[in-house]
Regions:
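Conserved luminal/periplasmic juxtamembrane motif of membrane-embedded glycan-processing enzymes
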Residues: 1-235
Length: 235
């Protein structure tokens, strides 16, 4: 959430071609990641962009946005810290951007049901099987759990955003030294990104090398197959 807020702020405050290039690359990568939801653009890239059809999934293109958004966010931080008159020029943009992000977090926290609690394919499969009608209480419980997860994540984002905005505000009005503000912002950013990344890649995602070696030791049947070197030994 902090990277996103700083990215939006950078789109407003930063001048020059670098901003437009990063913004354009971000938008294009997001549009391309929609795949069949924007099929004309996907077909255009497949037909005319070399090697684009080698992607295993269209979502892989989001790696561009994962690079451009943090880069523009860091450029925004850099200008905030080095330009002495940044606050005078862009205080309204700072208030507006942070306020809008806070309002979005609050809205999601209080109204998690405003967003779909099931994916399109998930809903179609459950509806076709008639499971919504057969087990209404079960799906009510599932929806309640998903709402609580959405609300908890919105609250988490809200707290990180308030903490980072508070540090930056204190720095911009001269109440906190730039070095301390930079260190505090880096720690908050690390905590924000690390806790999200750990959901997808944690300690349970890794195994010791010795376990992997043991898993691939040749079995007697493997040795028997390898012993047959004829060209037509496989069916």
């Amino acid at each position: 959430i902090i990277i996103f807020a700083l990215f939006v702020l950078g789109c407003i405050t930063i001048k020059g071609p670098m901003k437009w290039a990063l913004l354009a690359a971000t938008i294009i990568s997001i549009l391309l990641s929609w795949g069949h939801n924007m099929m004309w653009l996907t077909d255009l890239m497949i037909d005319h962009f070399p090697m684009y059809n080698k992607f295993r999934t269209v979502a892989s293109i989001l790696v561009i946005a994962e690079f451009t958004m943090p880069l523009l966010a860091m450029l925004t931080l850099h200008q905030m810290f080095i330009q002495p008159d940044w606050w005078k020029q862009h205080s309204r943009a700072f208030y507006g951007t942070m306020g809008a992000c806070l309002l979005v977090c609050l809205f999601i926290y209080f109204v998690p049901s405003a967003f779909s609690l099931y994916s399109t394919s998930e809903r179609d499969q459950l509806t076709a099987a008639g499971l919504f009608q057969q087990y209404p209480q079960l799906f009510m419980n599932i929806e309640a759990i998903r709402k609580s997860v959405i609300s908890a994540d919105a609250l988490r984002s809200l707290l990180f955003l308030v903490a980072s905005a508070g540090v930056l505000y204190a720095c911009l009005i001269g109440k906190l030294r730039v070095a301390y503000a930079a260190a505090a912002t880096a720690l908050i950013l690390f905590a924000d990104l690390f806790t999200v990344n750990k959901r997808y890649l944690d300690t349970e995602s890794f195994t010791q090398a010795v376990n992997n070696v043991e898993n691939f030791n040749p079995r007697p049947v493997d040795r028997q197959i390898l012993a047959d070197t004829a060209q037509n030994y496989r069916v």
